[in-house]
């Protein structure tokens, strides 16, 4: 897929119906030969729409108007390029816990959670948040996470979590203003509700910080997993992380995680991990495949806003 095609796909499959601003901006970038040429000089993982838009917003540029966005980006390209080369798409969306919860609640309790690509670790608190699956509510915490669930009997209990750890090449801290500013820049412009969720989840994490370890998902995962307490069910999980990892490392990661005790929850786009005999997704929007120990269970929207259960 060319860089231009990736921006078209992002605009149509991810942003359409969710962020008119990013749909419009993605399609504008896809037609901008000069900007595409600058992006082409970067490694593929550094050309992502979310990363470019987040870096420009962090630097104070506008994303509301494609022309203003282009002017700012071209005028400040050295700073934009530096941000693209040094930062990563670390969207830390606690709403993803809503699609993880049905799987987590059904596992033997208590749980030792280990998130790969944890960012600031906000998805390590599924037991602290509240949830709404249509008319079904569970939990009493903040934030409240809404998920439109189809084909699913929602859980009637929260998981019991006794250990929380995250592995990331660049862990972020909710107590560091610069890190919070980057997390905020990654939230799409119209999504005020997600900004409120970020603040509420950040308060939870700051009051009981998780163990966040800087490291590689293949080389450093076994050592961190070995620190999980005895008597707890180890659960290694990740959401929208492996697309940033070269295919050979994805294969190596899958081999490592399968050899660990406990369970593996993956929540990745269709082309990232191989799955057999999947049903048709519910629509043309981008959906992740939610799987437990390699067995597909559901289609899930990337921010946890909806899921279609088929497992």
Where do the model's predicted regions map?
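Short amphipathic alpha-helix with an adjacent loop that forms part of the alpha/beta core around
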Residues: 220-229
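C-terminal substrate-binding/active-site "lid" region of AdoMet-derived donor-dependent transferases
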Residues: 243-294
């Amino acid at each position: 897929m060319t860089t231009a095609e990736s921006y078209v796909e992002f605009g149509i499959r991810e942003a359409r119906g969710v962020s008119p601003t990013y749909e419009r901006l993605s399609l504008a970038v896809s037609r901008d030969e000069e900007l595409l040429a600058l992006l082409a000089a970067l490694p593929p993982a550094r050309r992502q729409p979310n990363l470019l838009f987040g870096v420009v917003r962090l630097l104070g540029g506008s994303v509301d108007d494609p022309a203003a966005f282009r002017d700012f980006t071209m005028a400040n390209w050295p700073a934009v390029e530096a941000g693209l080369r040094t930062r990563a798409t670390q969207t830390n969306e606690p709403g993803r816990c809503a699609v993880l919860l049905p799987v987590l609640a059904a596992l033997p309790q208590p749980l030792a959670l280990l998130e790969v690509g944890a960012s600031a670790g906000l998805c390590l608190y599924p037991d602290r948040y509240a949830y709404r699956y249509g008319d079904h509510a569970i939990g009493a915490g903040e934030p409240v996470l809404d998920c439109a669930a189809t084909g699913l009997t929602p859980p009637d209990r929260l998981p019991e979590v006794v250990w929380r750890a995250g592995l990331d090449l660049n862990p972020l801290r909710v107590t560091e203003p610069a890190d919070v500013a980057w997390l905020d820049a990654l939230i799409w412009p119209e999504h005020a509700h997600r900004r409120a969720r970020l603040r509420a989840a950040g308060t939870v994490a700051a009051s009981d910080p998780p163990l966040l370890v800087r490291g590689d998902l293949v080389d450093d995962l076994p050592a961190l997993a070995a620190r999980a307490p005895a008597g707890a069910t180890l659960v290694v999980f990740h959401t929208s992380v492996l697309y940033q990892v070269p295919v050979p490392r994805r294969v190596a990661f899958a081999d490592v995680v399968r050899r660990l005790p406990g369970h593996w929850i993956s929540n990745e786009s269709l082309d990232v991990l191989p799955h057999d005999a999947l049903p048709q997704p519910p629509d043309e929007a981008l959906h992740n495949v939610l799987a437990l120990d390699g067995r597909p269970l559901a289609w899930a929207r990337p921010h946890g806003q909806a899921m279609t259960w088929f497992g």
